[in-house]
A protein has these predicted regions:
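Glycine-rich phosphate-binding loop
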Residues: 101-127
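Ligand-binding beta-strand-loop-alpha-helix segment within the catalytic cores
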Residues: 33-105
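Glycine-rich beta-strand-to-loop/alpha-helix junction loops that act as flexible
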Residues: 11-16, 108-112, 175
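Short, small-residue-biased leader/transition segments that mark boundaries at the very start
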Residues: 1-2
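ATP/nucleoside-binding phosphotransfer catalytic cores, i.e., glycine-rich phosphate-binding loops
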Residues: 162, 166-187
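Glycine-rich N-terminal segment of FAD-binding domains in flavoprotein oxidoreductases
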Residues: 5-29
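Class I SAM-dependent methyltransferase SAM-binding "motif I" and its flanking Rossmann-like core
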Residues: 117-161
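A glycine- and small-aliphatic-rich helix-loop capping segment at beta-alpha/alpha-beta transitions
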Residues: 23-34, 57-59, 121-131
Length: 187
């Protein structure tokens, strides 16, 4: 099997993991996977967006995976984008990760410049979940999902490198030639 029946999966969003999520759904539909005891913690969420906003990462996960498998949505965690107190939002999310026993498998995509989650290259390894000001390049890259660049949130909550590296296993997925240099430099 791919993972224990009660595994804690760290999940990512963006275009890179969509193919993997489609494959997981296919295996679920064939009866090869059961998500009923799975817990998930997502890598990040835009600050200021509610989970029902169609640009939120909660919405993305519902649309691309959770709505298609038998996962208990009360055990699917995404940082609270509506929490205005950044310190509280981050502390709460770190506590969730600890309370579920840590992450068994962390799925990551890698950005063209080498970012994982919203952690830019060179981010401190000791950081846990934190609020980041999105870089201009990240805002531009994500603008394709919004009506205009002005609508792209300027901040996000993201797991830190410390959270990610604490996972028992990490699965880094990259697709397309635009990611080749970033992948090469990360190894």
């Amino acid at each position: 099997t791919l993972f224990r029946s009660n595994a804690v999966l760290g999940l990512a969003t963006g275009s890179t993991p969509v193919g993997l999520y489609k494959q997981l759904i296919e295996w679920y539909n064939k009866g090869d996977l059961d998500f009923s005891q799975i817990t998930s913690v997502n890598l990040d969420e835009y600050k200021g967006l509610s989970g029902d906003n169609d640009q939120s990462y909660r919405y993305f996960m519902n649309t691309n995976l959770f709505d298609h498998v038998n996962i208990d949505k009360t055990r699917t965690y995404v940082p609270n984008g509506l929490e205005e107190d950044s310190d509280k939002a981050c502390a709460d999310y770190n506590e969730i990760i600890r309370s579920v026993g840590g992450i068994d498998i962390q799925l990551l995509g890698i950005g063209g410049n080498g970012h994982i989650g919203f952690n830019e290259p060179g981010e401190a390894f000791e950081k846990e979940t934190h609020c980041v000001d999105l870089t201009e390049s990240t805002i531009k890259a994500n603008a394709r999902f919004f009506e205009s660049m002005d609508e792209v949130p300027k901040q996000a909550y993201t797991m830190g490198i410390k959270n990610i590296m604490a996972a028992k296993k990490i699965l880094l997925v990259a697709s397309g030639s635009a990611k080749a240099d970033a992948l090469y430099k990360s190894l």
